[in-house]
């Protein structure tokens, strides 16, 4: 690994993490794992806990561009990883929120945040090759590996996705990465929500470089990402208006800063079949 692959800050603080966990075991104190602190709103109720700061446990451990695999410590900011990959013409294969640059690799895996490209590119869970963690007994454990063709045993490493740190403190994560898309653009169409659902399902079933779909303010937005020839040919076939500010739209969706995220009313999420018709009936209060 050359110097260009090393972020400015790199430090192995795993021994400090073990010491802190040993002290918490002695006092039988719950532990709150904190990296960048960008996902505190996802951690449920407050309780009397010991804060374990892992933000200084950071740095790229190994990166082999030709193997499409990167290994980094859990406290590494995602922006550092993205910059390292971009220098080699590569990118993360999922699309996590960066939360003003403070989101870390470990927190992203622990919360399983993968962004608007998830239905097409997969989640961070799908891209995890291996992890190193420290469990509640202060044991350092390794699962998976650092190669794409890893068939050794049960895939425990992927169980960390969405576990919120309950299975141990993440120390290192190995991820599969991909070449960056040669071209990306967004098409938009004026249509109602039911029309958008039908349109999205029709388009999603075609072998095209679709990487995002959202209906917003009476318009369906479809993002295309991939080889320039594939994107251009899809534009010719699908038509629609090219949205010049498409990058801003997807960034706001990824970062959850679109206006509806901050609406005073309740925000509900439903996970259903894409073709399902959702009817809401909450009765009377």
Region roles according to the model:
Residues 33-39:
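Glycine-rich beta-strand-to-loop/alpha-helix junction loops that act as flexible
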Residues 2-33, 54-100, 113-145, 181-191:
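N-terminal glycine-rich flavin-associated loop
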Residues 40-46:
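Short glycine-biased active-site loop of nucleotidyltransferases that positions the nucleotide triphosphate
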Residues 42, 81, 142, 231-233:
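Short helix/loop capping segments that flank catalytic or ligand/cofactor-binding pockets
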Residues 197-285:
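C-terminal substrate-recognition/cap domain of FAD-linked oxidoreductases
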Residues 47-52:
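Short, well-ordered secondary-structure micro-motifs within conserved domains or adaptor modules
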Residues 94-95, 101-213, 219-220:
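FAD-binding subdomain of flavoenzyme oxidoreductases
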Residues 39-40, 111:
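Transmembrane alpha-helical segments of multi-pass membrane transport proteins and ion-pumping complexes
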């Amino acid at each position: 690994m050359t110097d260009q692959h090393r972020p400015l800050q790199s430090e192995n603080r795993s021994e400090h993490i073990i010491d802190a966990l040993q002290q918490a075991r002695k006092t039988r104190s719950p532990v709150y794992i904190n990296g960048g602190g960008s996902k505190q709103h996802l951690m449920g109720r407050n309780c009397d806990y010991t804060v374990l700061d892992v933000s200084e446990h950071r740095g790229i451990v190994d990166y082999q561009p030709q193997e499409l695999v990167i290994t980094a410590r859990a406290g590494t900011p995602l922006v550092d990883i993205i910059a390292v990959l971009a220098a080699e013409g590569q990118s993360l294969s999922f699309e996590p929120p960066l939360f003003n640059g403070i989101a870390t690799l470990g927190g992203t895996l622990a919360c399983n945040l993968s962004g608007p490209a998830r239905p097409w590119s997969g989640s961070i869970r799908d891209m995890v090759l291996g992890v190193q963690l420290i469990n509640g007994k202060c044991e350092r454990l390794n699962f998976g590996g650092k190669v794409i063709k890893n068939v050794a045993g049960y895939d425990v490493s992927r169980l960390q996705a969405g576990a919120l740190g309950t299975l141990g403190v993440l120390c290192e994560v190995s991820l599969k990465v991909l070449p960056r898309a040669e071209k990306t653009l967004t098409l938009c169409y004026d249509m109602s929500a039911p029309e958008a659902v039908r349109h999205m399902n029709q388009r999603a079933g075609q072998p095209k470089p679709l990487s995002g779909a959202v209906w917003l303010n009476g318009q369906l937005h479809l993002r295309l990402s991939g080889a320039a020839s594939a994107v251009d040919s899809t534009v010719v076939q699908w038509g629609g208006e090219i949205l010049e500010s498409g990058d801003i739209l997807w960034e706001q969706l990824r970062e959850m800063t679109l206006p509806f995220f901050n609406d005073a009313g309740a925000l509900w999420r439903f996970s259903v079949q894409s073709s399902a018709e959702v009817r809401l009936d909450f009765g009377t209060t």
